[in-house]
Regions:
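N-terminal Rossmann-like FAD-binding beta1-loop-alpha1 element of flavoenzymes
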Residues: 5-41
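Redox-cofactor binding/interface segments in oxidoreductases and associated redox assembly factors
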Residues: 19, 143-145, 260-262
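Conserved Rossmann-like nucleotide-cofactor binding loop
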Residues: 24, 48, 123
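N-terminal FAD cofactor-binding segment of flavoenzymes
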Residues: 27, 31-82, 160
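A conserved beta-strand/loop capping segment in the N-terminal third of enzymes
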Residues: 59-120, 125-127
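Predominantly flavin-linked oxidoreductase catalytic cores and closely associated redox partners
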Residues: 113-234, 249-254
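FAD/FMN-dependent oxidoreductases across multiple families
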Residues: 184, 210-289
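C-terminal helical "tail/cap" subdomain of flavin- and related membrane-associated enzymes
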Residues: 284-374
């Protein structure tokens, strides 16, 4: 094995250190045997991470994860005041992957490969050194997966979710609801997301696209109101809560503390907040580059044309938030389930992109295009 960071393999404490024990950091660490480094460590914060349900459309890089999914749905809906659109895909069913299950799996694989897992808070880094609350560590190569702060004013996908247990069977366990816009639209682009695990148990999230995060009470009231209005649920048990905020924009790449990967390295799809499949794609490309003897280099998992389309789309919905339900309805109506899954995972070809463009109302997008300078 060779040290990509320096010719003298004994000069550093570790040949490579991964900062951050989240999805990107541990997804890389679990494949340490494919890296051209001898001694590898992961530094992760001491704080216990909140368990999240990750929504995943499968792609070529998610096979190991999809087999661990809590549940998959071959049918899903987009619902607006215009009606409900049901899409289906047996090839790319929508999956719910629990973060705890995946991260535990990655840690186990990493440990089995001899990766050292270190708990600590990183306070500073240089090209080859990392300062933590327990002292300094040196490394030939540093990978940094910690999320950057979301810039003020950027659109954010923010949400609170409750996994609920109903007293009677009210959910359709064979059909997920990815977006239901029949809820309070006064605070931004707001929809309810429902993943039914059984006829009586489901994850229900209140999600908003806007630059402003609301008080918890707003999301929780929206969940209760929705369950009462559309499922007749007034008495429920909350089994679990989750909360999050995801940037909806192209974040500036930060190479100051090592090679950025994951959200820090631009893996989040701006228009959707989808990240898991793109993180796996980014890591696969990074490993292939290293295995071929090339130096580590940041690699975006997105195509430039998709990022360009996302920029225009985000500008349109930010300037016209009330138009958003119509746009998502139109896209769902124009695409098959397979098409939707391909588009969301970045596997679209030009014909599919054209389908999406043709489904959209032209005037708002032309205005956004002219204002963006093309």
């Amino acid at each position: 094995m060779t040290n990509q960071g320096n010719n003298d393999i004994n000069e550093y404490d570790y040949d490579a250190v991964i900062i951050g024990g989240g999805c990107a950091g541990l997804s890389l660490a679990r494949l340490a045997d494919q890296l051209p480094f001898g001694k590898v460590a992961v530094i992760e914060a001491k704080a216990k991470k909140q368990d999240h349900a990750w929504g995943v459309f499968p792609n070529a890089f998610t096979d190991d994860a999809i087999v661990m999914a809590r549940k998959t749905w071959a049918h899903w809906q987009i619902i607006t005041d215009q009606g409900a659109i049901t899409q289906s895909s047996d090839i790319r069913p929508y999956a719910c992957l629990e973060s705890k299950a995946w991260l535990t799996h990655c840690r186990q694989q990493a440990r089995a490969l001899g990766v050292e897992l270190i708990q600590g808070q990183v306070t500073d880094t240089t090209t080859n050194s990392i300062t933590t609350d327990h002292g300094m560590i040196t490394a030939g190569q540093i990978f940094d997966s910690r999320p950057n702060p979301i810039p003020k004013g950027m659109m954010i996908q923010h949400f609170i979710g409750h996994e609920v247990q109903a007293s009677t069977p009210v959910f359709d366990p064979d059909r997920a609801i990815l977006m239901d816009f029949r809820c309070d639209q006064s605070r931004g682009i707001h929809f309810i997301y429902v993943l039914p695990f059984s006829a009586t148990q489901a994850l229900v999230e209140s999600t908003i696209f806007s630059p402003q995060i609301e008080d918890n009470e707003f999301y929780e009231t929206a969940i209760s109101t929705y369950l009462s209005d559309h499922f007749g649920i007034t008495d429920k048990i909350i089994l679990r809560r989750e909360q999050g905020a995801i940037p909806m924009g192209i974040m500036a790449e930060d190479h100051s503390m090592g090679l950025p990967i994951g959200g820090r390295g631009g893996a989040i799809r701006p228009s959707s907040g989808y990240a898991f499949g793109f993180i796996q794609k980014q890591i696969s490309h990074l490993i292939n580059r290293l295995k071929s003897g090339q130096k580590p280099k940041h690699m975006t998992p997105h195509q430039n044309i998709d990022l360009w389309m996302d920029r225009i789309f985000l500008k349109v919905i930010r300037n016209n938030p009330k138009l958003a339900p119509r746009l998502f309805h139109a896209m769902a109506k124009a695409l098959s389930g397979d098409d939707m899954a391909r588009f969301m995972t970045g596997d679209a070809d030009h014909l599919l992109r054209l389908k999406v463009i043709m489904a959209m109302p032209k005037w708002p997008f032309l205005i956004a295009l002219m204002k963006s300078g093309g």
